From Swiss-Prot:
Its EC number is 3.2.1.21. It holds the Pfam family Glyco_hydro_1. The active site is at 196 (proton donor), 404 (nucleophile). Residues 1-30 form the signal peptide. This is Beta-glucosidase 32. It comes from Oryza sativa subsp. japonica. Keywords: Disulfide bond, Glycoprotein, Glycosidase, Hydrolase, Signal. The gene is BGLU32.
Amino acid sequence: MAAGARALVPSPFIVVVFLLLAAAARDASALTRHDFPEGFVFGAGTSAFQVEGAAAEDGRKPSIWDTFTHQGYSPGGAIADVSADQYHHYKEDVKLMYDMGLDAYRFSIAWPRLIPDGRGEINPKGLEYYNNLIDELIMHGIQPHVTIYHFDLPQALQDEYGGILSPRFIEDYTAYAEVCFKNFGDRVKHWVTVNEPNIEPIGGYDAGVQPPRRCSYPFGTNCTGGDSSTEPYIVAHHLLLAHASAVSIYRQKYQAIQGGQIGITLLGWWYEPYTDAVADAAAAIRMNEFHIGWFMNPLVHGDYPPVMRSRVGARLPSITASDSEKIRGSFDFIGINHYFVIFVQSSDANHDQKLRDYYVDAGVQENGGGGFDKEHYQLHPWALGKMLHHLKLKYGNPPVMIHENGDADSPETPGKIDYDDDFRSDFLQSYLEVLHLSIRNGSNTRGYFVWSLLDGFEFLSGYGNRFGLCCVDFTAPARTRYVRSSARWYSDFLNGGELRPVKPFVAL
């Protein structure tokens, strides 16, 4: 790492956070779930494509992720046709949740299972499955927290008009969301419209490493077409409008009767300057605006961040006055999926180049942080504290649900099940301590969900990383589940046990 890097000269804020964490760690044995606010929700999550399986059963048709994986683009050639096979094992999984003591289960509805062609006829078998899953959860006292769209766009809509790139997506998505409200809203009280709309446009339409594989040189190669300088912004705009449209329908027709809440879930990487240089500090601020502000600014203020307006220019879609009115305040809570910090340096020298994409527009270059250190995520729990502090100060302290937080390891040796994952318990405890401290300091966070309940297909790594509190034996036809030690640790905490002291960790 270069001289002057953050690892050598931490900011005063980080020093304070680290000292507070050290003090908290000394008293970690006193922290229980009852130290969190009354009504605080603890859970775990998955998504349909990642664990459901039954890809071609009971009327389900392909999503863009089915097409992508079957064309061999997923790491290791992984496909999710069976995955954890929750479609056939949901009762077993609900029993695992119940035994663990979860308050809630976050899952998604597969659009191509419920409405296989993306619009029109509802699949009765899909309707039956989700009704059964929801009823099973409620029977066991577990809240269903449901995501309406989690990346699995019906391939039929992609083929017909280009999917999210077309404004026609907004109408079809809204109709699909209303089917969900109408059929499940009497029991589902927590809705998420869209999962991570601030990353899907980058993976699918800038770098082209995810479906539908659209990009342009030099930002991506081997794509089926696309324009990395414009399409990510168009896709994000359509996702934002679709979200607002669904919320509008819910509030007009269903919320008062059904008594639920609705929000959106953003990927919450935290960007930190790589050095103490003024330019790097400015780069980190810009990147957080491009990453979180891309959606939070319209949701709170009705328009994209000024820094994006000035740097992206005419390539950033306009928000009309009527759309601004619909978007502003279109949430009852904000979901955040947080895993790590990313250190950035300024690369503003490239900003005037003719070929530009999202990262060139932001004027940053990533230089460490995010991702895996050897086998596991680097441990930077202070980054979650910074994210929550940022949401509190900049966006009016909205209600927040931590919808994903967790750590992964590599697959077990074939034929051997490894129950010992203390690294995961240590990771989760470190973040829970920071979360508790943030709440004490005024953060309006109301829930925390571990990613994930089960091992499953991961969008970035196939089956190369395992996030599950519960292991799934993918070599067994029955997809046998095994409870890992982290599940027992979480269960002990959820049932009133004290957080055990964790191994000392370095905050930077």
